[in-house]
Amino acid sequence: MNQKKIFFDTNVLIYAHDRSSTFHTDSASLLKLVFSRQIKGIIAEQNIIELYRVLTNSVAMKGKSLTPLQATDLIAKTYRSGIFNIVYPDSSTIDKVMELAVSKSIVSAKIFDTRLAALILGTDTDYFATYNVKHFKEIEGLNPLTPPQILATLS
């Protein structure tokens, strides 16, 4: 069987660790498929930084934030242990970001989603797991689906 390659958005990673989220179960299920090697997980270095920011923010984590050491440990063990492919930008990524920014009239903080999209477009990916499908559906070449949609496709 051909292992599906899933690129993860940061929101899915966060929900996988936030048991209070209504999105936790499906996000955690998708993450478990990576650890059981049923799918290949792909993330960007940007996801790691964004994940750290949220995990250490008490407002975002509803009073249950992690210390810097706890967040760094979780990230090291979960995402930097070799299970996930981590994608890094290069000069062609920046070119693609600028191209998309102009063609899609991207402004302000939306540039960060555009940067992630550019990284995904440069990666061999079957699906992009996100709960922000609407932010990405207009970008040709991406296949953004929610974790429940991906889980249904895989079953």
Regions picked out by a protein language model, each given a short descriptive name:
Residues M1-K5, T114-S155:
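Acidic, PIN/NYN-like endoribonuclease modules and their adjacent C-terminal/linker elements
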Residues M1-I43, A60-Q70, E138, L151, ...:
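Short, well-structured N-terminal submotif of metal-dependent ribonuclease cores
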Residues I42-E45, T130:
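Short beta-strand segments at enzyme active-site cores
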Residues N11-V12, Q46, R115, K134:
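Alpha-helix/helix-capping structural signal
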Residues K77-T93, M98, S105, F136-S155:
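Short acidic, glycine/proline-enriched helix-loop-strand junctions
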Residues N2, F84-Y127, Y131:
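Active-site neighborhoods of divalent-metal-dependent phosphate/nucleic-acid chemistry enzymes
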Residues V54-V87:
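Helix-adjacent hinge/juxtasegments
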